Amino acid sequence: MFKHAVLALAMVASGLPVLARAEILGAGSTAAAPVYRIWSAGYTAASGTTLKYDAVGSGEGLKRIRAGTVDFGASDVPLSSADAAKAGLVCVPSVVTGAVPFVNLPGMPHGQLRLTGEVLARIFLGKVETWDAPELHALNPGLALPRLKIHPVVRADGSGTTYHFTDYLSAVSADWKAAYGTKSTLAWPADFTAAKGSGDVVKAVQATPGAIGYVDYNYVLDNDLNAVQLRNAAGHFVSAQVSGFRDAVLQSAWNRKGDFTAPLVNLPGPDTWPITMGTFIIVPAVSANGARTLDALKFLTWGYFHGDELAAHAKFVPLPERVQAIAYRELARVTDTAGTTIGLQSMPANWAK
């Protein structure tokens, strides 16, 4: 009941009609595209307003919201409070998913290959070069590993999926941390295949026997990819699934403190997926076009209040209510150039307490 009352307040607080515009423009994360599109279908049915979303990658989404060419940017990389303030932006989470390594090994049963974070790092450092290497045999004694060269496929563009993938590798491998660290864009070795966007990563791996790449969970499901098992912080080999992403959120500072800038990788728990990742919506803190920004806020608010089941259907994890409450407080700071709060000023600031 409380959620629905707050939603109604948010919709009317600005005094603008719900159907003020016919279309919202968003761009960014390829990982989050499925949930924004499924939310859009529900939101259009409820409001008449549509969403045009371009899945162009997190880096490009951030560029477009900074340039003011979209109503919201979408990124899998959270902006720190300092970076958001410096850029004049507000960044809040929408849902949670996971990054998943996958392979093209002819004859290999789906979901059976086991890797540790350390070995995965060595593969992407170019230090493990064939699939029959001793460290891979040690992890997979019951599998017939082929004598194939390993062909890493990586992202060429600025990618939130790359950010979380490398954040995980930095957490489990000192060698990786020293060589690359956590980044959205890397100077990959010249003999790696670099693809723009998750869809092209999938195509490149599928076209190359011996290839390994990484994408978010929805691409694994939609393309029936051969995802690997990873050893998590508890020492258990686990497969990527929604319950493992949810366990990571419950173990994290997101749930304990409402801190959605905290990492979700390599967290404790017997079933936790070790490369869990949030995805975020970014809007201007001071909007030159209040009506357009208000429409973006209405869409996100609708997703928070009505989109949990739709997010789960799309294989994403909805946010804990405590995290949503912190997000509302952030959104309530958005104003127009006259200093007037747009849209969400009626939300109680103490809801999270």
Place the predicted regions along the sequence by residue.
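C-terminal segment of classical bacterial N-terminal signal peptides
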Residues: 12-21
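A cross-taxonomic marker for long C-terminal extensions/tails that follow the last structured domain
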Residues: 7, 14, 350-353
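Flexible loop/hinge segments at secondary-structure junctions
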Residues: 21-353
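Bacterial N-terminal signal peptides that target proteins for export
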Residues: 1-7
